[in-house]
Amino acid sequence: MCGIAGSSDLEKAYTLYKLNLKRGSHSSGFMALSFQEDKECISLVEKAKGIFNLNLLKQRIKDLDNVCNFSYFAFHSRAPTNSTETIWKESHTHPFNNDSYYVAHNGIISNFKSFPEHSSFEVDSSIIPYLLTKNHNISQTYSKLQGLLTSWVFTGKKFYVVKAGSSLWVEKDSFSSSEFENAERIKEDGVILELKDNFLTVKDSFKYTNPYFI
């Protein structure tokens, strides 16, 4: 079981990340995002065994912020769901990247092995950005997947949260897999929320059936 979280406020994003650690803390992933077109960089990605230290993340952000002007922060915490993995590997840690797509996924892709390319990926979640690169369409890509699929996706200076099966709580521009103060639970599945004007709002939807009914 994994957890995802994010906010425009780093301290809040980290607090929401910590709320999810009860769901799994084998490894952690972090992304600081910039949405400014004139900036030389678009993101800072950090991956770690265990739990992030907030002060270390702040220092990494400070080192690059004059170049990137980061304005949103997203986390992932992981407990392996499709293996008995005990040794940490950076290549197995979210977010996964292919071309311009970055994805952090909370759940399991039950039809992972039905994709002809599956043998090229050691972690089921890592196939998602690859498929997005082929389709360039989030709703079409996720409609081909089965299982628990809630994720965050960053591409082309746009940020999305996909709700499909796994739990999701949202309050303005903040989200988490775990309930937090003033947050609303997103009950509908098969929806794609886009971060726009400091709010996460529904942008699109896709056909989704929860095979686990949870």
Where would I find each of the regions flagged by the language model?
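Conserved short alpha-helical segments that host acidic/polar catalytic motifs at enzyme active sites
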Residues: 1-214
